[in-house]
Amino acid sequence: PQVGLIPFPRV
């Protein structure tokens, strides 16, 4: 999911 402005791969 996209967190803020930078898309972080949440695992």
Swiss-Prot record:
GO terms for biological process: neuropeptide signaling pathway. One of its GO terms (cellular component) is extracellular region. Pfam families: Periviscerokin. The keyword Secreted applies. Keywords: Amidation, Neuropeptide, Secreted. The modification Valine amide is found at V11. Mediates visceral muscle contractile activity (myotropic activity). Belongs to the periviscerokinin family. This is Periviscerokinin-3. The lineage of its organism: Eukaryota, Metazoa, Ecdysozoa, Arthropoda, Hexapoda.
